[in-house]
């Protein structure tokens, strides 16, 4: 209960920045690979013909750090530019649910079928477009979308309507959702592919307190139908509940209704509570980082995977926070790299999100108090210290970069099996671009030579790569040659407790 209370307090505070039944399991463990090898060489088999999910990308909740409907910008222009370059050029996030403030702080009018645009925070959206969206798009972020979730925190005026007239309440929710998509199109010139519809609506934050899976489903249907009548193809990211199991239950209720299902673009989930096997960085390092992933956590993710397969809907991991380690440390980087590997492997997650894309020291002090260190935001991708004009890519940011810098939208995750449970390998093929990529995590205390055989393709030349270990981040590697005769195998030395990314053409 303490963890959930802390979650609600923290996320409610962060929500005010934006606006102006899981239990940790310590039971059985499961292994997904062989025991740690006693020799120095690790063998990895990759089957390029055995495809899993299509990758969508990497992202984060995106706070513009512009408040009061655009009047209060926390970041000096040069510092903002550096921060955005770190997020979108260097780490290479492409996705993000973007805060739009309260958006509709008071009901626009009494008719949910008539939109009074004067009541919307369009000025704030214009400022966000000028200072965040347009620069981010220029740097490659082509998957940003409205994050004005349906929440009684953001729209308290909905409460009496909900209590007195449920049908009108659904229409008001639909108007709220559709207005954001329409104005996003008008201001940015782009129709968003997605809309983040809910965030911990029933559990954790409980942003729709007193709601039910039926109400969630009704909102999806009403808002989706109104979007289509407005000519908008935007689909919804649903669930994003407190834990994988709770997210699966909520998503199952929505997807079982064919009228609602047609509007769903992805199933979102969170990995909480904070002590869970994949939220806590220490638990990650002690569990899957030692070759012992938690069996219940794996089962929950496989249930999400199976649900997505059943309805042909992608699965996204849409938030993680409270890792608990210094964001400057290699342990923090390696822990989140392990989590990404496992979310992709067990849930077939097509997207992985950090907590926030950017966060700054002024906002941190104003909303959490001066005693709270900016470094406590360890799962935000880039931290900005305004007093020293410094921009820090966190361990979580570097971990995401080890994947995002090498894996583009449309790539396929393919089957990879390591004969050492301390050496984890994710493999991807991208037929459109003729590239294959690999992320290798060595959790052992010693360096390893990793020999990778790829069946089903032949490389046209050597691979290139980068490596993180100790205090070094994304260090460029020399050319990694492939076998001359067949071009389907390569070997690379990976230091102890390191993360390595490699890519080559085929």
Regions found by a protein language model. Name each.
Residues 31, 35-81:
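N-terminal module-boundary/linker segments of secreted carbohydrate-active enzymes
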Residues 418-461:
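Carbohydrate-binding surface patches
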Residues 65, 88-257, 272:
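Substrate-binding cleft and catalytic face of glycoside hydrolase catalytic domains
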Residues 170, 209-339, 346:
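Noncatalytic carbohydrate-binding groove/subsite architecture in carbohydrate-active enzymes
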Residues 481-506:
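C-terminal beta-strand-rich structural cap/linker in extracellular carbohydrate-active enzymes
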Residues 60, 195, 267, 343, ...:
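Conserved, mostly hydrophobic/aromatic
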Residues 314-401, 414-419:
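Aromatic/acidic polysaccharide-binding cleft in carbohydrate-active enzymes
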Residues 12-24:
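Bacterial N-terminal signal peptides
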């Amino acid at each position: 209960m303490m963890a959930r209370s802390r979650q609600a307090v923290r996320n409610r505070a962060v929500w005010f920045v934006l606006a102006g039944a899981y239990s940790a399991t310590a039971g059985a463990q499961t292994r997904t690979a062989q025991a740690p090898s006693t020799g120095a060489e690790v063998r990895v088999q990759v089957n390029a013909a055995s495809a899993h999910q299509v990758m969508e990308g990497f992202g984060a909740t995106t706070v513009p750090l512009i408040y009061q409907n655009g009047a209060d910008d926390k970041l000096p222009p040069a510092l903002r530019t550096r921060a955005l370059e770190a997020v979108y050029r260097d780490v290479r996030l492409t996705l993000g649910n973007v805060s739009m403030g309260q958006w509709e702080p008071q009901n626009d009018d009494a008719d949910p079928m008539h939109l009074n645009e004067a009541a919307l925070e369009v000025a704030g959206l214009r400022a966000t477009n000028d200072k965040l969206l347009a620069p981010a798009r220029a740097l490659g972020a082509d998957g940003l979308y409205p994050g004005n979730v349906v929440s009684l925190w953001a729209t308290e005026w909905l409460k009496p309507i909900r209590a007195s007239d449920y049908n009108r309440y659904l229409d008001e929710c639909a108007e709220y959702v559709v207005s954001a998509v329409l104005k996003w199109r008008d201001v940015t010139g782009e129709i968003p592919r997605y809309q983040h519809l809910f965030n911990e609506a029933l559990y954790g934050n409980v942003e729709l307190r007193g709601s039910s899976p039926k109400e969630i489903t009704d909102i999806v249907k009403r808002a989706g139908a109104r979007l289509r009548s407005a000519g908008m193809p935007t689909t919804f990211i649903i669930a994003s509940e407190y834990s994988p199991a709770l997210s699966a239950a909520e998503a199952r209720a929505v997807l079982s209704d064919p009228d609602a299902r047609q509007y769903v673009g992805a199933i979102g989930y969170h990995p909480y509570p904070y002590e869970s096997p994949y939220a806590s960085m220490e638990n990650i390092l002690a569990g899957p980082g030692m070759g012992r992933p938690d069996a219940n956590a794996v089962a929950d993710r496989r249930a999400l995977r199976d649900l997505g397969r059943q309805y042909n809907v992608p699965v996204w991991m849409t938030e993680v926070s409270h890792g608990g380690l210094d964001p400057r440390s290699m342990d923090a980087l390696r822990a989140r790299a392990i989590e990404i590997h496992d979310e992709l492997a067990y849930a077939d997650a097509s997207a992985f999100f950090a907590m926030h894309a950017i966060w700054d020291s002024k906002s941190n002090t104003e909303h959490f108090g001066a005693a709270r260190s900016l470094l406590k935001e360890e799962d935000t991708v880039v931290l900005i210290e305004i007093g020293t004009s410094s921009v820090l890519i966190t361990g979580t940011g570097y971990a995401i970069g080890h994947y995002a810098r090498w894996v583009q939208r449309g790539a396929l995750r393919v089957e990879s099996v390591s004969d050492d449970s301390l050496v984890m390998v994710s493999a991807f093929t991208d037929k459109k671009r003729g590239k294959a990529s690999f992320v290798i995590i060595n959790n052992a205390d010693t360096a390893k030579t990793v020999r990778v055989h790829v069946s089903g393709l032949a490389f046209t030349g050597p691979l290139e790569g980068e490596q993180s270990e100790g205090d070094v981040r994304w260090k460029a590697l020399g050319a990694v040659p492939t076998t001359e005769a067949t071009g389907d195998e390569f070997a690379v030395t990976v230091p102890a407790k390191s993360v390595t990314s490699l890519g080559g053409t085929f």
